[in-house]
UniProtKB/Swiss-Prot annotation:
GO cellular component entries: cytoplasm
Protein name as catalogued: UDP-N-acetylmuramoylalanine--D-glutamate ligase
BP GO terms, sorted: cell division; cell wall organization; peptidoglycan biosynthetic process; regulation of cell shape
UniProt entry tagged with the keyword Nucleotide-binding: yes
Major localisation: cytoplasm
Entry keywords, A to Z: ATP-binding, Cell cycle, Cell division, Cell shape, Cell wall biogenesis/degradation, Cytoplasm, Ligase, Nucleotide-binding, Peptidoglycan synthesis
Annotated metabolic or biological route of this protein: Cell wall biogenesis; peptidoglycan biosynthesis
Ligand binding (ATP): 127-133
Reaction equations catalysed: UDP-N-acetyl-alpha-D-muramoyl-L-alanine + D-glutamate + ATP = UDP-N-acetyl-alpha-D-muramoyl-L-alanyl-D-glutamate + ADP + phosphate + H(+)
Amino acid sequence: MIPVRGLEGRKVAVLGLGRSGLATARALEAGGAEPLLWDDSPEARAKAEGQGFTVTDLTRERAFEGVALLVTSPGIPHLYPAPNPVIARAMAAGVPVDNDIGLFFRSFATRDWDAFDQMPRVVCVTGSNGKSTTTALIHHILSEAGRPTQMAGNIGRGVLDLDPARDGEVVVLELSSYQTDLARALTPDVAVFTNLSPDHLDRHGGMGGYFAAKRRLFAEGGPDRAVIGVDEPEGLYLAGQLSVAPEDDRVIRISAGQKLERFGWSVFARKGFLAEWRKGRQMASIDLRAMPGLPGAHNHQNACAAYAACRTMGLAPRQIEAALASFAGLPHRSQTVGEKGGVRFVNDSKATNVDSAAKALQAFPKIRWIAGGLGKDGGIVALQPHLGSVVKAYLIGHSARDFALQIGATDHEICETMERAVARAAEEAQPGEVVLLAPAAASFDQYPNFEKRGEDFMEKVKALL
């Protein structure tokens, strides 16, 4: 646990009592604060009381008298589409609002500077797609190289549940836009921006607000090094804003297709090979085609980001290459479930938006595509240029009929359910083809989350193998 510093003897309200909320309450209590907890769910409140915490109705009048801070969970809206009533009440009372990420940065290692021969460091990863894989890959590379490391944030443990800092340790955090938008302190040593595509726009008031939330990680006084994906205009702009000149090697530009030889420091992938260039010289080349856990151009971008971050930590190219080769990948992200009769079954349930689905569709030459769910704003019209590899689409969920109208001349069948889609795709697939779940939609019409959707796909596939 990371005890929260600077709030000793103060009352701190905690809104949202899921995993991060209860971890926050424990960390506040350990640091000497008095946490006051609230959740709309009676079950969540009862659980908190059962653990000995004080539950206070934060919806009542004058609930924030004497309260120094409100800490809220990331899933609770604080501005768009409308502030949660409790957050609105806190802001009206002049009470600052923070989250567990902000508390982490104000507390991690801050009282132990003299105890370390080598200071702990924090690497943060944000972006629209590839965050989890990049975060896990950095953690894996550091572990394989023998460096002490922990992983948390939007993946793995809550940040305040981490163990106290160790000498020379690297903490790797995956941060969503919800987390970066609200945190009052964001001071990573290395910050990674993978890419940007439309997502969560209702929570940020549009694309500009979404990008602004991501950019907060790179605010002045932020990271010593920045790793920036420049395959979209926003990343290109961000890299330019952070650089004092093209040869500035404090910013490492990464790409999944562009040659970036003219910059101070760059890492890019072309035709399956990763190349590192610094100050006009090629420093390394790695064959990513030999990495079974990193198929496709989108994973090559993830590899470039992780490689660059680990190079800033002093790791040698050959150390990183060996770890890339042993990385097994993450569940529900280009995950091979099995193969039968020359047909491969791949679970990419995490491809919940157009951009991530497009990258999944580019990874294989002949695809039986299972798509659909709860469609997002704009539908999937933007996927039409990427459907050349699709032999046939099998459409499921609430958006099935809308998707059928949006995929042009691509052969398709409305299946409604995962069971029928898997059965039909497996029945019609030919040797050399891939049955790919890449929904391009949220899961909430039929499943509680994308993990359950992916598990259902794998269950149906394994029954056929």
